[in-house]
């Protein structure tokens, strides 16, 4: 039996017995015991941190220098790819981070985008690209909205002026855009899973590159992150998980309970010490030894180790360690010295298994207007860097999101059983407005759409009337819960699906293309869509009145069209399954669904200007369909065109299914669907996206003329 001294500070100055075979020397133990005095290292590193904190130069942002014109960036100007960073000194790396932050502020001020998250990871981005060798080493950015500094350092700086614009750079990481974007993102909580897959694939291929998954900014509230960590701990493949902890749970309007506690010198020094290679390798050996001992000795060693981890890393390490990840932290995510030191140690340590580095950052770091804002400038329009003022265009109408919130508040005023649920998107869904009025009846579950849906199902079981407000594209994340926990049990949960259809600059990851297709196939679901903001009020009232089955409705991003709203913002419940005719015409009928009705009305004006008066109808419901309306249109017109801002398999498919079974296609009727094309449409302006999708009024009018054999007129309306 040999004695191994763990010389931790304070109460951990104790001797722990560890079994070893005296006949077999253990050079790792002896080298570490004789060459490492932890208390001495601790005090030494504490002194180093204190000295360093007194010599750090003020950054451009801390000096109050913000530029309406492009700021001077002499070091960034020399960096085209990460390889150009490798010979920079630590002082130059700090200046690089300052310049990178200023450059990010300037670029986003011209394009708009996700600013706060990118500012929070500047130092981390510099450290990662300095220590690791991308693209051979895989660096994954969860969600991807914090990837702007990464894009600047990986050959895309000159294109930053095209960010989120048509044919420009994406606002998230995108595999087809750069080899440095090893995994495409846009939704949260995916990178640990993807990174683990890459790590296992690397091992099976016999390679030795590093895999680093950066996750945080609210993404750790999603179950997939924990599923991935659980599997990572079991598979024990080498990978690094960096927890970017900016205390952000809800996006983009969460406010903090108080200031983020500072990551002090003690935590910094101990975290660097814990990443020390001899200590980690010792723990690997000790782990194997204690497994052989068994019994009380094993339990004692485990308790001492657990307490040591608590002393070294502060709070929060137990969960990650229990999942099988070696925990290091918390680390100051804005201290390049510490980040580089720890990343180098972790990279060079020859031990197996996943490592989690807990990095504490501040969203909006280095830009006071972002730091002071409640939303940390999570997503911004174009703005003046010198004042922080955003150039938001004045609109005569409010957004559909706001109209939905007002409609739901009006319903909740009259019905105390109405409650609201959202998944970390209070501002994005308008539920922050509902929260102000009904603080005990609004539930933010974090980025956890699966839980949100089943939580709403439980509320419905108790007689409440839940409205679950989730973006259309995020509803995809909870589809099994919609089917199994809601529709199968016929529970009256109401799904408000914002951002339906094309969404402009956010691109295909946020495009609400598929909700009608995957909702309308469910046997018990009522599926609705308003054609304007007044209809939205009526459909919210309709959903509140449907209490014997689930229902859903979609509405677009953007502002209303300016129609008169219902008195008192209180909608009137519609007859379920009944549409309406808006314009009476002949020969041709345009049957629109949702906001596409407005495109149909505009197309009708184009056709009328060329002598063709067409019928325009608003379906209102995809399920149940207004069969009487469809029969009437089919029998009284030569051509029926269904128009929707959704994918194949949606509203038009349900219409033609009914018409085929009803025999309405057995005669001379010509039916044509206009839907989103069967491909993902890249980010761009709403007008450009609509044109690419073939859903402009001119496209609809040209389709009508082509069906009628009037090809010349079709060409003319497109020019």
UniProtKB/Swiss-Prot annotation:
Residues 1-57 form a transit peptide. One of its GO terms (cellular component) is chloroplast. The keyword Chaperone does not apply. It holds the Pfam family DXP_synthase_N. It comes from the Eukaryota. Binds 1 Mg(2+) ion per subunit. Binds 1 thiamine pyrophosphate per subunit. Its cofactor is Mg(2+); thiamine diphosphate. Mg(2+) binds at residues 217, 246. One of its GO terms (biological process) is terpenoid biosynthetic process. Pathway: Metabolic intermediate biosynthesis; 1-deoxy-D-xylulose 5-phosphate biosynthesis; 1-deoxy-D-xylulose 5-phosphate from D-glyceraldehyde 3-phosphate and pyruvate: step 1/1. CDD domains: TPP_DXS, TPP_PYR_DXS_TK_like. Thiamine diphosphate binds at residues 145, 186-188, 218-219, 246, 367, 449. InterPro entries: Dxylulose-5-P_synthase, THDP-binding, Transketo_C/PFOR_II, Transketolase-like_Pyr-bd, Transketolase_BS, Transketolase_C, Transketolase_CS. It is found in: Plastid, Chloroplast. Keywords: Chloroplast, Isoprene biosynthesis, Magnesium, Metal-binding, Plastid, Thiamine biosynthesis, Thiamine pyrophosphate, Transferase, Transit peptide. Its EC number is 2.2.1.7. GO terms for molecular function: 1-deoxy-D-xylulose-5-phosphate synthase activity; metal ion binding. It catalyses: D-glyceraldehyde 3-phosphate + pyruvate + H(+) = 1-deoxy-D-xylulose 5-phosphate + CO2. Homodimer. Belongs to the transketolase family. DXPS subfamily. Catalyzes the acyloin condensation reaction between C atoms 2 and 3 of pyruvate and glyceraldehyde 3-phosphate to yield 1-deoxy-D-xylulose-5-phosphate (DXP). PANTHER family: 1-D-DEOXYXYLULOSE 5-PHOSPHATE SYNTHASE-RELATED (PTHR43322), 1-DEOXY-D-XYLULOSE-5-PHOSPHATE SYNTHASE, CHLOROPLASTIC (PTHR43322:SF5). HAMAP family: DXP_synth (MF_00315). This is Probable 1-deoxy-D-xylulose-5-phosphate synthase, chloroplastic. It comes from Capsicum annuum. The gene is TKT2.
């Amino acid at each position: 039996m040999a004695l191994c001294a763990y010389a931790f500070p304070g109460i951990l100055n104790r001797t722990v017995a560890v079994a070893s075979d005296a006949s077999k020397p253990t050079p790792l133990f002896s080298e570490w015991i004789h060459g490492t005095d932890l208390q001495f290292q601790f005090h030494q590193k504490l002194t180093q941190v204190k000295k360093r904190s007194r010599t750090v130069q003020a950054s451009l942002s801390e000096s109050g220098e913000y530029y309406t014109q492009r700021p001077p960036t002499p070091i960034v100007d020399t960096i085209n790819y990460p390889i150009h960073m490798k010979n920079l000194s630590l002082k130059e790396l700090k200046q690089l981070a300052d310049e990178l932050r200023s450059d990010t502020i300037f670029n986003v001020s011209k394009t708009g985008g996700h600013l706060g998250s990118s500012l929070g990871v500047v130092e981390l981005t510099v450290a990662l690209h300095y220590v690791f060798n991308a693209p051979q080493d895989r660096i994954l950015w969860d969600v991807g909205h914090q990837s702007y500094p990464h894009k600047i350092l990986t050959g895309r700086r000159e294109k930053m002026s095209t960010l989120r614009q048509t044919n420009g750079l994406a606002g998230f990481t995108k595999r087809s855009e750069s080899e440095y974007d090893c995994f495409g993102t846009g939704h949260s909580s995916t990178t640990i899973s993807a990174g683990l897959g890459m790590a296992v694939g690397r091992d099976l291929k016999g390679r030795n590159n590093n895999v680093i998954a950066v996750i945080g900014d609210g993404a750790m509230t999603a179950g997939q992150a924990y599923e991935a960590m659980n599997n990572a701990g079991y598979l024990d493949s080498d990978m690094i998980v960096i927890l970017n902890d900016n205390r952000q749970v809800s996006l983009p309007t969460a406010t903090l309970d108080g200031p983020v506690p500072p990551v002090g010198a003690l935590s910094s020094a101990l975290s660097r010490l814990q990443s020390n290679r001899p200590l980690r390798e010792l723990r690997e050996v000790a782990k194997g030894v204690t497994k052989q001992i068994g019994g009380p000795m094993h339990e004692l060693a485990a308790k001492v180790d657990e307490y040591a981890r608590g002393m070294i890393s502060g709070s929060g390490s137990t969960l990650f360690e229990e999942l099988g990840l070696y925990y290091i932290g918390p680390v100051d995510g804005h201290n390049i010295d510490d980040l580089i030191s720890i990343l180098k140690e972790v990279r060079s340590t020859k031990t197996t298994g996943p490592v989690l580095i807990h990095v504490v950052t501040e969203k909006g770091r280095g830009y006071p207007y972002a730091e002071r804002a409640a939303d940390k400038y999570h997503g911004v329009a174009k703005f003046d860097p010198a004042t922080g003022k955003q150039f938001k265009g004045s609109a005569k109408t409010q957004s559909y999101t706001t109209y939905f919130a007002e409609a739901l508040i009006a319903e909740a005023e009259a019905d105390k059983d109405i409650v609201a649920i959202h998944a970390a998107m209070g501002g994005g869904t308008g539920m922050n407005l509902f929260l102000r009025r009904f603080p005990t009846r609004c539930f933010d579950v974090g980025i956890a759409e699966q839980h949100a849906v089943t939580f709403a199902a439980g509320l419905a079981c108790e007689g409440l009337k839940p409205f679950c407000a989730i973006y259309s594209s995020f509803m995809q994340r909870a589809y099994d819960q919609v089917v199994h926990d809601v529709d199968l049990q016929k529970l009256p949960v109401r799904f408000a699906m914002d951002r339906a259809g094309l969404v402009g600059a956010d691109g295909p990851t946020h495009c609400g293309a598929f909700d009608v297709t995957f909702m309308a196939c469910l046997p018990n679901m009522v599926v609705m869509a308003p054609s304007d903001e007044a209809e939205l009020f009526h459909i919210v009232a309709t959903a509140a009145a449907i209490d014997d089955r689930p229902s859903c409705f979609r509405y677009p991003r953007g502002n209303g069209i300016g129609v008169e709203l219902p008195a008192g913002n209180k909608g009137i419940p519609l007859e379920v399954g009944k549409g309406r005719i808006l314009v009476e015409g002949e020969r041709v009928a345009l049957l629109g669904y949702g906001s596409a009705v407005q495109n149909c009305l505009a197309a009708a004006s184009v056709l009328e200007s060329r002598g063709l008066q067409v019928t325009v109808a608003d379906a209102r419901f995809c399920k149940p369909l207004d069969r009487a309306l469809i029969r009437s249109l089919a029998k009284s017109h030569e051509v029926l065109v269904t128009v929707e801002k959704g994918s194949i398999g949606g509203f038009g498919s349900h219409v033609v299914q009914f018409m085929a079974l009803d025999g309405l296609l057995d005669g001379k009727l010509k039916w044509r669907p206009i839907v989103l094309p069967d491909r993902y449409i890249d980010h761009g302006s709403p007008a450009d996206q609509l044109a690419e999708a073939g859903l402009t009024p001119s496209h609809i009018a040209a389709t009508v003329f082509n069906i009628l054999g009037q090809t010349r007129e079709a060409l003319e309306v497109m020019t």
